[in-house]
Amino acid sequence: MQVLQSCWKSAARTDRGKVRKRNEDSVLDQPERGVWLVADGMGGHQNGALASRLIVEEVAELVPNDDLDQQVQQVRQALHVVNRRLGYEVTVTADQPDAVMGSTVVALIGDQQRAVCLWAGDSRCYLWRNQRLYQLSRDHSLLQQLIHEDQMDPQEAARHPSANALTRAVGAHEQLMLEILEFSVQPGDTLLLCSDGLYQAVSAGTMSHALGLISPAAAVEYLFSHALSGPARDNISAV
């Protein structure tokens, strides 16, 4: 999504990719409210798709609020509601061998002066500003934890058998822990929310070129054309 002088413009897309049988990602694109979200579901059968869809539905149904701080609080509360619901769903289906129902989430709530990113998991938020690309979110994964705590260097951590395991996600634990980042926005800023299926499929250079294009729709089209030209082993989502 792009910050203009008077309003936000955005575009969204999600795709199953070339390997997965179903798409367990969900996206929310509401520029008129200043709310955007990407959720990457996890779990067997339809569990992941249900988890990500519940997140989007709960946030989409929130009453619009012109106060940014209040709107952020509403989104946080909605995610905690979904976290409790997913815990209940797992409890009643615990006889299934793959009774896992959860989802990453990365959300952006913004007005003309400020934006707030909140997330759990490894879906990401990027900022393109003054011809530079910044990753605003930090993955909640074992890989990132090992690096952050200086237990392993990046190359060694990447070889860990559980490197991709998530340390936070909606539905993963009884208490949901969201990380929150607030920042000022400037005209010309472009922000990207995406699942790991996208950022693992394109280079930083490709992402930078896409976010420098004239419109969000053009950026999304460019990103997906490159991501789908490769193996596309995972679901792909971007806003």
What are the residue ranges of the model-derived segments?
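PP2C/PPM-type serine/threonine phosphatase catalytic domain
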Residues: M1-V239
